[in-house]
Amino acid sequence: MRLYSFFICFLLTATTLLSCKNDVKNDTSEGAETAVDTTVVRSVKESKEEQKAIANSVLAKLMTTDETRTFTRYIISASLTDVISKGKGPYTIIAPSNEAFSKLSKATLDSLVGQSGNKTLQTVLKGHIVIGDFSSSSILQSVKNGEYTVPTMGGTSLTFFMEGSDLLVKDASGAVAKLGKTDILSANGQVHVIDAVLGNF
């Protein structure tokens, strides 16, 4: 009888220990699955947020603005899309119109987009990307008492000034353009369209 009681006690103890061990394994497995699920959810959420940011970026605005299709094509050729679509900015793009590019000679265009022209193209395009968020109204306010200079991504600067009722912009080389369509707003900046390509090339 004592032997039987001892055996029963031993069996119950062993069963309890085994059950506890399995519970620990299950908890560990469930914990791992939860961690994986959390990581996946976070990745999906980050991916969606990134896609939303790109869809509302200055690059998206350039792509959907008829006047800046050529400028956008060159931005893509120069591998600057990630900079202005994923960068927090803000960026103010002073974008030459399609017509502005059509005024350039074939030789000039070939030098910009030729096989060895990417570096030159990047330099020219970065000279049209201003660091900061500048609306046309804020620029007009700033030029009331004279010229207003802002830095570009290319390490150069652009200077805004008035001539009669026109708002103009010039670069260090002396090239001048007139602002036309302005304040095309995006999540990480805005776009102003100009009637000439700036830069010394």
Regions found by a protein language model. Give the residues of each.
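Mature, structured domains of secreted/extracytosolic soluble proteins
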Residues: 2-9, 20-201
